[in-house]
Each structure stands twice: as structure tokens, then as C-alpha cells.
Curated annotation (Swiss-Prot):
InterPro entries: RRP36
Gene expressing this chain: RRP36
Segments of this protein annotated with the region Disordered: 1-82, 94-181, 310-343
Species this chain originates from: Paracoccidioides brasiliensis (strain Pb03)
Coiled coil: 214-266
Keyword Nucleus: yes
Keyword ATP-binding applies: no
Name this polypeptide is given: rRNA biogenesis protein RRP36
Subunit structure: Associates with 90S and pre-40S pre-ribosomal particles.
Protein purpose: Component of the 90S pre-ribosome involved in the maturation of rRNAs. Required for early cleavages of the pre-RNAs in the 40S ribosomal subunit maturation pathway.
Sequence ranges of Basic and acidic residues compositional bias: 310-320, 328-343
Cellular component, GO annotation: 90S preribosome; nucleolus
Family per similarity comment: Belongs to the RRP36 family.
């Protein structure tokens, strides 16, 4: 077979061979062959025109010749396909090695160009924004994280945030908290032989156990007031005395407020205890099936009424005046600045 014999030949590529000359020679040889075929066709066509007047017999001969030519062409194609099927891979490798790099690159580029869709060539867009100029080689510029809707919303963090490589080997010790044994439920639980009612109401039982401290506080408060009165009577313009007077005033107000809060809490406990006692008696007598629990607002209202009934005339006036000033200052804070100066 001619193709196998050609492929099995040892072919050595020329080093200084120019591809352009090779292709030009091939094209020239192809052109000469095509020219000869064209001349033959023209001769045939001239002969056919001259013989067209002879009759229908010659037309039949021409059709038979065309059939013979088509049969010969099909036989040649079948021979080529059969020879190509029998080619070994070694022969194909040798043929590929014999071809130059330029020929292979040109054929590859021609194949790629033929496969590409025909249309207007699109050049890559020039970097217009700052992000494109900052990241020219990146496929997608980094997206900026959106801001939070409010300061209470959770913060947004990128998943590409690098994790810290520092590791806490020894954690900081916990900050020790001050624990007063007078108000500690653990201490009271051990001291009362494990009575759960005392452990839960530790502050109540601690206040009962240390009720004598209130008498000490009242005595100290009276001594501070006497000392303040003595300093104010002297009316000295010494800066040291003025500072001492201010310090005593602050200390007296803080102690009096603390005593007032203790009294209010004690009164709240008395109100709750009296209400629970009444509810238990009503359930025991059958007047009620379930107890009624007071709310915090009801307890506070009951405490205010008790304090107001126990006050004297002057104390009531002072309390009402303080209440009025408190409400007025609250309303003034809610008032706009334009109206505050008028009133």
C-alpha cells in the first residue's frame, strides 16, 4: 500500500528549511496539477461540444464513463480508509515527529480559529474603577462588606479573615470577689444546720441577726450632725474647715439615704408578711381556695401609704414638697430648650 510505505520511511526534518518555501512549492505543485486537470476538462468539454451533434448514443457513453470514474474514486477512498485503519501508532508517532514545530503550531491555531464563532472581536474592558486598577490580575474584585443597619446588629466579618496563631497556654486567674459572711447563703446554710428556708432568705435572717448595727448607725449619724453644727457656728473662712463641712454633708446624706432604704425594705417585708398571714387565715377558714399574691407595685403603694400615715405634719409637708420638686424637674427635663427659659 502506498501510504504505509511512505509512513514507514525514515524522514529527517531539515533544520534550515523555511516553512513558507515548503508551502509555496506544495501550492505550486498543486496548482500545476489543477491546471492540467482543468486543461483536460476543457479538452473534454470541447470534445463533448463537438460531438454533441452526433446523437444520443454518445451521451450514453459519457454516462457510463462517469459511472466508471465514480466507482474508481469510491474504490480509492476505500483503499485509503483501510490503509489508515491499519497504520500502527509507531508510524503515526514518526510522522508527527517528522513535522516541524511551526507546522503543528500553525495547524493548531488554524483549528482553534475555525472552531471560534465568527463575530465582532471583544477586547477585554479597560480597568475603569479604582478596584480594577488595584487588582488588575484578579478575576473578581473583593466585595466590600455592607455596613450594619444599627449598632445593636451583629458585626459582619469576612470568612477569609485569618485565624490568630496565638494560643492561650495559661489563662488569667479569675478576679476574686468580696464575700460578706453576714449575707452569704453558704455560711448561713452551715450555721443553721441546713435549714433551706433560712438559706433562701439569707438577707432577711442576716438583717435580723445584725439588727444591732442600726443602733450604731443612728448614733454615728447624730454625732456627725452635731459636729457639722459646731463647724457652721464658728463661721471660719479657713479652706480646711470648708472642705470638712462639705465632706460631712456628703457623709450625712449618704448615711441618711442608706438608713431610709433599710427602713423601706423592712417595711416592704412587713407588708408581705402581713399579707401572707391574712391569706393563710382566709384559706384555713375556707373563705379562699387559692392565695392571692401581691405585685411589686401594690407593695410599693402600701409602703408609701404607711409611711405617709406615720409622718407628722411638718414631715408630710416636706415629703410633699420633695415630691413636687421631683415631678417638676422630671417635666422640665422632658420640656424642649426653647420653653425652659420662658417658664
Amino acid at each position: 500500500m502506498p501510504i504505509l510505505s511512505k509512513l514507514n520511511k525514515r524522514v529527517r526534518a531539515r533544520v534550515e528549511e523555511d516553512d513558507f518555501e515548503h508551502f509555496s512549492q506544495e501550492s505550486a505543485s498543486d496548482g500545476s496539477e489543477l491546471g492540467e486537470e482543468d486543461e483536460e476538462e476543457t479538452d473534454d468539454s470541447d470534445g463533448s461540444t463537438s460531438e454533441s451533434d452526433d446523437g444520443s448514443g454518445r451521451d450514453g457513453d459519457e454516462s457510463e464513463n462517469e459511472d466508471l470514474e465514480s466507482d474508481s474514486a469510491s474504490d480509492a477512498n476505500s483503499d485509503i480508509t483501510s490503509s489508515l485503519n491499519n497504520i500502527s501508532f509507531g508510524a503515526l508517532a514518526k510522522a508527527q515527529a517528522s513535522l516541524g514545530k511551526r507546522k503543528r503550531s500553525t495547524t493548531l491555531t488554524a483549528d482553534i480559529a475555525s472552531k471560534r464563532p465568527k463575530g465582532p472581536s471583544r477586547s477585554p474592558p479597560a480597568p475603569s474603577s479604582k478596584e480594577d486598577q488595584k487588582y488588575p490580575n484578579a478575576t473578581k474584585p473583593p466585595q466590600k462588606l455592607s455596613h450594619r443597619t444599627s449598632k445593636h446588629a451583629p458585626t459582619i466579618q469576612s470568612s477569609r479573615h485569618a485565624v490568630t496563631r496565638k494560643r492561650t497556654v495559661i489563662e488569667n486567674p479569675a478576679i476574686p470577689q468580696a464575700r460578706d459572711p453576714r449575707f452569704d447563703s453558704v455560711v448561713l446554710n452551715h450555721s443553721t444546720n441546713g435549714n433551706p428556708s433560712i438559706a433562701t432568705n439569707a438577707t432577711i435572717h442576716a438583717s435580723k441577726n445584725y439588727a444591732f448595727l442600726n443602733s450604731y448607725r443612728t448614733e454615728e449619724l447624730s454625732q456627725l450632725r452635731k459636729r457639722l453644727q459646731n463647724l457652721q457656728r464658728e463661721k471660719s473662712k479657713d479652706t480646711h474647715d470648708e472642705r470638712e463641712i462639705e465632706r460631712l454633708k456628703r457623709q450625712i446624706t449618704s448615711m441618711s439615704d442608706r438608713m431610709r432604704t433599710f427602713e423601706r425594705k423592712e417595711m416592704e417585708r412587713e407588708v408581705l408578711a402581713g399579707h401572707r398571714r391574712k391569706e393563710r387565715e382566709a384559706i384555713r377558714e375556707g373563705k379562699k381556695s387559692q392565695p392571692w399574691f401581691l405585685k411589686k407595685g401594690d407593695v410599693k403603694r402600701e409602703v408609701v401609704t404607711r409611711r405617709f400615715t406615720e409622718m407628722s405634719g411638718k414631715e408630710k409637708q416636706r415629703a410633699l414638697e420633695r415630691r413636687r420638686k421631683k415631678i417638676a424637674s422630671k417635666e422640665k427635663k422632658e420640656m424642649p430648650w426653647a420653653r425652659r427659659g420662658v417658664e
